[in-house]
A protein has these predicted regions:
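Active-site neighborhoods and metal-handling regions in enzymes and metal-associated proteins
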Residues: 1-413
């Protein structure tokens, strides 16, 4: 269990940034139906989770600052023995207090939330702060209600984004642990790679190995691509036959992430099926480029640098290599390179796999990034990426995953 002081501290930071005479309203969200009465596995709104540690539907959180005094209340669904018979035991107020670091007196029945909401919406001396980054309808419905009365509503996600961008030790260690679980699962899956193995077999092995290491809510849909399926970057429907079969002389691309304490890993690995046939093997030629890009990327990352600057450096290195292969002209432009370099090199990482933060923001110590240079060459019938996770430090960056990219670990069979 995560130390509740972490969530208490997050709320203190949030409240310190909250303007006076303001009430912030956040919601965990509601379960989503898959079909009929079957539901998807639930994941709380990430800003709500950041402030509470609660991963259950139907909760509301109200943090108010009035005349400098901060009050916090969480509203929880009442226990219902009939619902619990079908869906399992629900937390009682003491359980909720233990997770969130709130006093039990600050945990209230959800029925009281409507009364509190009405009181706040009626009070014109209190400004309302809602989460405009939410995928839920509730904040936007409330925004419409408040604005009908001529009052302005502020966006609390500006506060949570600034907090979530700078990771605390618990957060970086959670990402490190998620990366460890992910890589252990990849290592176990690698043992199955051989000519004739299917994407489906490798996919199920990855998810089994992550689940048995206590990661059930994965960071994103697991990707396993054999051969030319690697040209579909988010190939998340593994095939049992046809193009989904690993062939001698081809590749297997995996892109996968465990989740630990709510935090995501994002790891991509490529494996070569069968021994390369000398220096002319195009898999090895492309691997040499990707390894050079990775080294340059991790050398580049540090405080004050940007995603745009990182991409620019990757395009320059890749462009010179592509020109040397006769694939683009020597006087290439960025557009020439992007015919082969399809995606951004990096993104923020945290409670979301593509975590919050503006893409034009300079890197700062405490940012966590996933770094994934990738090149895809249709003329060669091959393309792949290798991805690792890192923490921006005061003088550069620190890998949170292993950084494996040696040919010895990539060639299988």
């Amino acid at each position: 269990m995560v130390n509740p002081s972490f969530y208490r501290h997050n709320r203190e930071l949030f409240a310190a940034a909250l303007p006076d005479s303001t009430a912030a309203l956040l919601f965990s969200g509601e379960g989503k139906r898959m079909s009929s009465d079957s539901e998807y596995r639930f994941l709380s709104d990430r800003n709500f989770f950041y402030l509470t540690g609660i991963e259950n539907p139907g909760f509301a959180l109200v943090i108010s600052k009035i005349n400098g005094e901060v009050s916090t209340f969480i509203y929880a669904p009442a226990r219902d023995s009939m619902k619990e018979r079908w869906s399992g035991k629900r937390m009682d107020f003491a359980d909720i207090a233990a997770i969130t670091g709130l006093d039990v007196s600050e945990v209230l029945d959800l029925e009281k939330y409507e009364e509190k909401e009405f009181e706040l919406l009626k009070n014109e001396d209190v400004n309302i702060c809602l989460d405009f980054s939410s995928v839920m309808e509730k904040p936007f419905d409330l925004k419409s209600q408040v604005e009908k009365g001529g009052r302005k509503v502020t966006d609390l996600s500006e506060i949570t984004t600034s907090l979530r961008l700078i990771k605390q030790p618990h957060e970086t260690e959670s990402i490190r642990e998620a990366a460890r679980i992910t890589e252990e699962a990849i290592d176990e899956m690698k043992k199955l790679i051989r000519p004739g193995v299917s994407e489906y077999e490798l996919y199920t092995k990855l998810e089994y190995e992550m689940a048995r290491r206590s990661s059930m809510n994965f960071a994103f849909e697991t990707i396993v691509s054999c051969g030319k399926n690697a040209f579909y970057l988010h190939h998340s429907e593994p095939e049992k036959d046809g193009d989904g079969i690993a062939m001698e002389g081809s590749i297997v691309q995996v892109d996968v992430g465990a989740r630990m304490n709510g935090y995501c890993a994002d790891i991509s690995r490529v494996f070569f099926v069968g021994q390369p046939q000398g220096t002319d093997d195009r898999r090895m030629q492309l691997l040499e480029l990707i390894r050079a890009l990775r080294k340059a990327a991790f050398d580049f990352i540090g405080p004050g640098k940007t995603f745009a600057g990182l991409n620019s450096q990757m395009y320059d290195i890749t462009g010179k290599w592509l020109a040397g292969q006769g694939l683009i002209p020597d006087n290439f432009e960025e557009g020439d390179v992007r015919r082969y370099y399809w995606h951004n090199t990096s993104h923020f990482l945290g409670l979301d796999v593509h975590d919050v933060g503006p893409r034009d923001k300079e890197f700062a110590a405490g940012n966590c990034l996933a770094v994934e240079p990738g090149v895809y060459i249709p003329e060669w019938g091959i393309g792949f990426r290798i991805e690792d996770d890192c923490l921006v430090t005061e003088d550069g960056c620190l890998l949170l995953s292993s950084g494996k990219d040696s040919p010895e670990g990539i060639i299988v069979g």
